[in-house]
């Protein structure tokens, strides 16, 4: 196990705790603000040091592209991307693959398999997992093939990452209400935001409450 400096351990703990609390890693700016660094570049230097020591993995170009590779605690509990251990409370959740146009998201034909996860890694209990397709949410740390933990909901606060149905399509985006309009924000500048036009068929399928990094499942 790599030896971390006290500051590196503090940053590692912040990353781990932020993921456990929100389901997503912090940005460089958030790390800098937490520790009083003069700029996000200082946070980046610490992150690169942690990556060199093999305890995290960085995704280039993604503001939240931080993945825990090991857990560092007295009891050596697994991080939130690990398979569940025996003796801990487990949830069995349906894993949703591709969603056919116009059909319910949890229709039997959409369920790839049942997936067991450690319940303790989520502050809010999810109802299902959705396999992410594409890189439109890359800068939120959500990558192609990842499993997004989703709590079913028909309403969500501004800024929440949601699973939305727009016409026959289902998409993962950040919800933003501007005046009387709804906008679905991509977390990748290569993708265009979606503006929900008045009268367009739109509904929320759920709110993201966590993430499981893809490991070939």
From Swiss-Prot:
The organism's place on the tree of life at top rank: Bacteria
- Report the enzyme's class at the first EC level: hydrolase
Signal peptide from the UniProt entry? none
* GO MF term list: DNA binding; serine-type endopeptidase activity
The site (Cleavage) lies at: 101-102
The chemistry this enzyme catalyses reads: Hydrolysis of Ala-|-Gly bond in repressor LexA
- Among the Pfam families in the record, one is LexA_DNA_bind
Task: Give the keywords, sorted.
Answer: Autocatalytic cleavage, DNA damage, DNA repair, DNA replication, DNA-binding, Hydrolase, Repressor, SOS response, Transcription, Transcription regulation
Q: Which Gene3D superfamilies has this protein been placed in?
A: Umud Fragment, subunit A, Winged helix-like DNA-binding domain superfamily/Winged helix DNA-binding domain
Q: Which residues bind DNA?
A: 28-48
* Function according to Swiss-Prot or TrEMBL: Represses a number of genes involved in the response to DNA damage (SOS response), including recA and lexA. In the presence of single-stranded DNA, RecA interacts with LexA causing an autocatalytic cleavage which disrupts the DNA-binding part of LexA, leading to derepression of the SOS regulon and eventually DNA repair.
- HAMAP family xrefs: LexA (MF_00015)
Say which family it is in.
Belongs to the peptidase S24 family.
What quaternary structure, including any partners, is listed in this protein's UniProt entry? Answer: Homodimer.
What name is this protein filed under? Answer: LexA repressor
Gene that this sequence comes from: lexA
